[in-house]
Amino acid sequence: MKRNLLCIVALALAAVLCTGCGVKDEDLKSDPLVNADGTAPVGKTLVAPAPPEGFTLLDNKDILAANGLYYASWVNGEPQPYENSEGKTVNLYDAQLTLVVQENKTEEKAASAVSGWQELAQQNYDISDTQTLIAGGQEYTVIQFTYQDESNPYAFGVAAFGQKGTSAIEWELSCQESYTGDALAVLTEFLNGCTY
């Protein structure tokens, strides 16, 4: 069961990030869950801050809520059509920030999920830096990386892995070469603005 849930999470992340995706506009017609102040609750674990200048909430879904899996994403730049590895035309942005929250029954399961995500990152990315960051009172392991898969339209990124009680949390900012912002600063701003 634990392995199956980890596989589901890995497949969800791969579908979102590793295939060079984005999502079609018509797939985003569902009302995203956003508060009046621009903050976005993601599961029961956290409320993501209103996005910094230049970023827009693209999606906020409870993709597998029955399994405690929640997903949100923010984008920067204008959408550009892109044909992904599956032959589907999707929108691609200068940068896309993805948040995945997996709410578990135990802290051990949350720790296992975080560990699994970190292992996947080591397998799929060339990691140039790893550090511990405390933001918004929460400790994260932060990596900076480039993508190993040259067919991925995103060139580099930064990710943060953390655990809050029984919840596993992963933030990942994927950037094209054209992105001129400071990826680590943007991610840190999001992390500092979270409430748990």
Go through the PLM ranges and name each one.
Residues 16-20:
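C-terminal motif of bacterial Sec signal peptides marking the signal peptidase cleavage site
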Residues 37, 66-73, 136-144:
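Short, hydrophobic/aromatic-rich segments at coil-to-beta transitions
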Residues 55, 169-196:
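Surface-exposed amphipathic alpha-helical segments
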Residues 22-24:
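Bacterial signal peptide processing site
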Residues 1-6:
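Positively charged n-region of N-terminal signal peptides that target proteins for export
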Residues 115-159:
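Signature of long, low-cysteine stretches enriched in small and polar/charged residues
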Residues 51-104:
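Secretory pathway targeting signatures of secreted, lumenal, and periplasmic proteins
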Residues 73-74, 154-164:
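Short, surface-exposed beta-strand/loop micro-motifs that present aromatic residues
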